[in-house]
Each structure stands twice: as C-alpha cells, then as structure tokens.
Curated annotation (Swiss-Prot):
It comes from Fowlpox virus (strain NVSL). This is Putative Nudix hydrolase FPV054. Residues 74-217 form the Nudix hydrolase domain. Its EC number is 3.6.-.-. Mg(2+) binds at E131, E144, D165.
Length: 231
C-alpha cells in the first residue's frame, strides 16, 4: 500500500491544489482539499463522515454485504443462473458469500482461503433534494446506526475523495467531513439490524485491512492537522 509521509501530509494541508494518491490491490484513491462552494456546485453529492466518539475513537461502518458479492449478484438474471467468478476475487467477500458462490458454481468446490475480511465504509450517502449536507449526514448516521448515533458537531473542512475500484471497473466520487458524536465508543459496540451496516467499529482496530492506510490518512488530515475545526 502507498506509504504517506509527514511531508506529503503537510503538503495537502498547505496546498489547496495538492492531490494525494493511494493504491491497493483493489482500489486507487485520490484525496484533495475542497470547500463548501465546490460541493454546492455538484448536483449528485455523496457526503460521508469520519465519526469521532466522545472518547476520541474514530469509527467506521462494517458493511453487511461486500461490494464484490453485490456486483456478482446484481448481474444475475434469475435466481438459478450460474455466473463466472474469478477465484482471486473471493478474498473480497464474506465467508457466507463465498459459501454460496461455491455451492452455485458449475462444479461445486471448497474454497480454503477463508479469512476475516471486512468491508469497511465511511458512514453517509447521497444528499436528497432540498437537504443540506448536514441534514443528509444526520439522517444517514441515524439510519446506518439504528438510531444510536447523535451528532454533537461537524468539522468545517472537507476532503474530496475519488475511489476507483480496479476490479469492478467503477469510480466513486464523494466528500468527507469530520463529525463528532455524543456517544462513547462502548455505547456503539453492538449488533445492528439495518440493511447496510452490520456493526460499527474502531478504525484503530482495522490496521490489517487494505483500506486502513487511506482511511487513517483521512482521519489524520481532518483531525490531527486541524482540518476538523468545529463549526
């Protein structure tokens, strides 16, 4: 994974036009400074939050369904249709998803590469008509946490994220802001039942995840480097 240096971190802090790029086996991510005016000119805004608990733990969502499996299933024209899946892509799926893929293969097989894969995501989503970005985040955070999270305040600096999924050949655009919540970390560690997020967790506990380095960079940039000034 791309190794970000303190010099590059400072470069993004000081230079509005600077773009920092990370690359993993699966994704290419660019991160750059932006502002509210830039967001308002975007007609299809997706806004996300790097949430910080009241005891200063950055939290992320663990998605219920992997993007890889969702992509495979979305191409299925009937429930019984068998689809080709690259075995190298199974490592980006959950064990129960891999099991279903194995059962539905032309020649049923056993996959021995089971691991502790987690699909990490920032909380948030698309801004609806007549919503502000803050109203959108308030709604999304409530929905994705089963009503657990309540917002204390937002930061006033925003990053623009461009995420290219090299396997799925799709590119996602969004904006990220820091969000301080009222809850302690211990208050949010419980199973969730909404359709998108199965649990919330500490970013610090996911250092072995492919996405960790760029998510940690976002955390450092928005918080440690004073991009997270409170509104």
């Amino acid at each position: 994974m791309f190794d970000i240096s303190r010099e590059q971190q400072n470069m993004l802090e000081k230079n509005k036009d600077c773009v920092i790029t990370f690359e993993t086996n699966r994704e290419r991510i660019t991160i750059e400074n932006t502002n509210i005016k830039d967001i308002l000119s975007d007609r299809r805004i997706h806004i996300f939050a790097l949430c910080i608990t009241s005891d200063n733990i950055p939290i992320i969502g663990i998605r219920r369904t992997s993007f890889m499996y969702q992509s495979v299933i979305s191409k299925r024209r009937s429930f019984s249709e068998i689809l080709a899946v690259d075995i190298n892509h199974l490592k980006y799926m959950y064990n129960n998803e891999i099991k279903e893929i194995c059962i539905r293969s032309i020649v049923p097989f056993t996959y021995s590469g089971f691991n502790n894969f987690e699909e990490l995501v920032l909380l948030g989503g698309r801004v609806k008509n007549k919503e502000s970005i803050y109203q959108c985040l308030s709604r999304e955070l409530s929905e994705e946490s089963d009503g657990i999270l309540t917002i204390k305040t937002f930061g006033n600096k925003i990053l623009k994220l461009t995420i290219e999924d090299k396997i799925l050949r799709r590119t996602f655009y969004g904006y990220c802001i820091v969000c301080f919540i009222d809850q302690l970390y211990s208050e949010i560690i419980k199973p969730l039942y909404n359709i998108e997020i199965k649990e919330l967790g500490s970013l610090f506990d996911r250092s072995s995840n492919e996405k960790y380095e760029y998510l940690h960079f976002i955390y450092n940039t928005l918080l440690t480097y004073k991009y997270g000034g409170v509104l």
